[in-house]
């Protein structure tokens, strides 16, 4: 696989909504592999295709080696808890910039795997935070961007 260049904020592609993936083929699996290699090189724990300029709804997350790699195609939040949790968040597109955000503590995500099979997953803790952050990125919402000028 390949480490690809990561777009840096304020690249306008980072605020554009990504299109749904419709082809579940070798090209999609290769893109997922490139995202994983790029995320590890950054380093980071989550990355979406828009981070590398590909406006498709594909996310790769690896919280730790023990947790393994998770790949989400066309993810969407199906349910979110009313209880909230605060976490510091950053982005591979804005190195060194973090922001403390309050988000739902638990959620259920509907997505497809790289073969196109439909999945439903419950998440809490860091996984819930990472999923919400990356889904925001895919719809063109980069939560930390308002802090960029403070960090520069």
Q: How would you name each of these model-derived features?
A:
Residues 1-147:
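Positively charged
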């Amino acid at each position: 696989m390949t480490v690809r260049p990561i777009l840096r904020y304020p690249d306008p592609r980072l605020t554009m909504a990504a299109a749904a993936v419709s082809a579940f083929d070798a090209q999609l699996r290769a893109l997922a592999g490139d995202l994983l290699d790029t995320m590890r090189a950054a380093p980071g724990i989550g990355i979406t295709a828009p981070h590398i300029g590909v406006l498709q709804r594909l996310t790769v997350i690896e919280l730790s080696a023990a947790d393994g790699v998770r790949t989400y195609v066309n993810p969407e939040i199906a349910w979110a808890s009313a209880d909230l949790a605060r976490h510091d968040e950053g982005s591979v597109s804005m190195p060194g910039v973090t922001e403390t955000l309050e988000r739902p503590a638990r959620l259920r995500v509907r997505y497809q795997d790289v073969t196109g099979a439909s999945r439903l997953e419950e998440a809490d803790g860091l996984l819930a935070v990472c999923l919400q952050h990356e889904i925001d990125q895919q719809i063109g919402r980069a939560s930390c961007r308002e802090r960029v000028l403070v960090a520069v």
